[in-house]
């Protein structure tokens, strides 16, 4: 019997012009019609997902929009190819579990 529930999530990556930044694209809307940028961990309160991403020691900033997340790593970090599998697996599991990406109320309250 096929188990029904949360959909299977796939994540692929796209390079950006900045070699320290990588775009992770999901087959699911994450933040429809909006975007939010977290320059550092202290700004990530409105996003449980961003808070979790900042637990990776090499993550410098997080940008969440429509169906993608753009991550910037610290320049001292290993090559993206060394950390992409870990990030992809984390995002896949996080999204398949149906966890909250952005808390809308906190995001609105955090706007300047």
Predicted regions and their residues:
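Short acidic amphipathic segments
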Residues: 50-68
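Long, contiguous binding/interaction regions
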Residues: 2, 13, 19, 52
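Short glycine-/aliphatic-rich beta-strand segments at the starts of folded cytosolic domains
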Residues: 17-40
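N-terminal mitochondrial targeting presequence
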Residues: 1-8
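Short glycine/threonine-rich beta-strand-turn micro-motifs
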Residues: 67-76, 80
């Amino acid at each position: 019997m096929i188990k029904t529930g949360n959909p299977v999530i796939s994540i692929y990556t796209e390079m950006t012009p900045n070699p320290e930044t990588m775009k992770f694209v999901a087959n699911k809307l994450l933040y429809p019609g909006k975007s939010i940028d977290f320059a550092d961990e202290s700004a990530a309160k409105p996003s449980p997902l961003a808070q979790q991403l900042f637990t990776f020691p090499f993550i410098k900033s997080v940008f969440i929009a429509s169906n993608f997340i753009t991550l910037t790593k610290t320049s001292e970090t290993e090559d993206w190819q060394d950390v992409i599998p870990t990030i992809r697996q984390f995002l896949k599991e996080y999204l398949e579990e149906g966890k909250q990406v952005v808390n809308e109320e906190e995001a609105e309250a955090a706007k300047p």
